[in-house]
């Protein structure tokens, strides 16, 4: 299957599964952070959209442990940057219908929680097709160490994803099962 076919198949399954309660294990994510010995406590995340893994409880847990949360915002040049946000802060909806932070405090996160449509055993991912996360990870890795953690349902795992030179491999994938 090509990426477009995989997206179509997974979107359908993800929509059907959306009524079920899937919870991420925040302790597993914290164990990754300890293992990697990340110095800063700045986490780039995403606001759940289009039946993605719900990150809101995870953000609340991380804030209790003094992590700072950042969410992406897309600018007019189709570039993604991350801005501070707290679970108590309001959001604004962009032209794609995605909630974004209002803050103008931009920073590079140390850890990036990445939404995805599908992933494989080699930690390749398929996103929505805009290349936002691939470009962002590529840009940041030149400047500093960043750990990318894909968040997914276990049913989003596929056998093999054909990649191109612009696709950035994740460091980890966390599902509701592990």
Question: What kind of feature is each model-predicted range?
Answer:
Residues 1-100, 107:
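N-terminal active-site beta-alpha-beta segment that forms phosphate/nucleotide-binding
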Residues 73, 86, 102, 152, ...:
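Residues at the C-termini of beta-strands that transition into short coil/loop
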């Amino acid at each position: 299957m090509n990426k477009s076919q995989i997206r179509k198949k997974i979107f359908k399954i993800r929509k059907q599964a959306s009524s079920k309660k899937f919870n991420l294990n925040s302790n597993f994510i914290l164990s990754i952070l300890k293992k990697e010995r990340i110095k800063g406590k700045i986490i780039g995340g995403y606001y759940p959209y289009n039946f993605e893994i719900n990150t809101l409880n995870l953000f609340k847990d991380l804030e209790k442990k003094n992590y700072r949360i950042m969410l992406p915002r897309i600018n007019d040049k189709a570039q993604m940057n991350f801005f501070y946000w707290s679970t108590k802060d309001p959001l604004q909806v962009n032209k794609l219908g995605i909630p974004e932070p209002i803050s103008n405090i931009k920073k590079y996160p140390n850890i990036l929680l990445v939404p995805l449509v599908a992933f494989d055993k080699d930690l390749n991912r398929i996103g929505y097709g805009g290349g936002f996360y691939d470009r962002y990870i590529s840009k940041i890795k030149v400047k500093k160490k960043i750990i990318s953690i894909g968040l997914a349902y276990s049913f989003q795992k596929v056998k093999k994803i054909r990649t191109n030179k612009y696709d950035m491999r994740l460091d980890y994938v966390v599902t509701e099962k592990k």
